[in-house]
């Protein structure tokens, strides 16, 4: 029977550093699933549409950077092995989203946000602190974050033209995955955050969306 490998604190820090590099360096994320955009037709968008869609996809890409950092921070400090594994699995799925968003941003002639390292560091710290408090709080933070992401995705789907089936296909699949992450976190015992906490999280999310839309 296969035995589970136990990592030392140094091993985990090195793994975290490797994940951070793969998250932040261009073209370094290798998705396990092909982009949903591949099978969708190319359409011609005007300059204004292209610029706006690129801005929305940049926001979504940074959101995935934050999610990746959040999961990694929580996995580092999670108390129960099964919670750590759940965080690591969710982080692997977020790599798909990262790669898909970056591919689409490049296709639109734009680039990911230069603020990604800042948001990665902040999110990693928040995730690590949540994990140190308790696994219940950590899982609750995942659920609240993913619900916020789903809200942003819904708003973006309303703004992206129906003819841009490539961008829409990516966001629609991301929404399915994010909702599943939120449900799984709550089913695993995650704490349901009260409205004031969720409101504070939404205010922080607005700072991210406003700043990364253009840069």
From Swiss-Prot:
Catalyzes the hydroxylation of 2-nonaprenyl-3-methyl-6-methoxy-1,4-benzoquinol during ubiquinone biosynthesis. Pathway: Cofactor biosynthesis; ubiquinone biosynthesis. Disulfide bonds: none annotated. HAMAP family: COQ7 (MF_01658). SUPFAM superfamilies: Ferritin-like (SSF47240). Fe cation 2 binds at residues 94, 146, 178, 181. The gene is coq7. Fe cation 1 binds at residues 64, 94, 97, 178. It comes from Pseudomonas putida (strain W619). InterPro entries: COQ7_proteobact (IPR047809), Ferritin-like (IPR012347), Ferritin-like_SF (IPR009078), Ubq_synth_Coq7 (IPR011566). Keywords: Cell membrane, Iron, Membrane, Metal-binding, Monooxygenase, Oxidoreductase, Ubiquinone biosynthesis. Belongs to the COQ7 family. It is found in: Cell membrane. One of its GO terms (biological process) is ubiquinone biosynthetic process. GO terms for cellular component: plasma membrane. NCBIfam families: DMQ_monoox_COQ7 (NF033656). It is a peripheral membrane protein. Its cofactor is Fe cation. Its EC number is 1.14.99.60. Signal peptide: none annotated. This is 3-demethoxyubiquinol 3-hydroxylase.
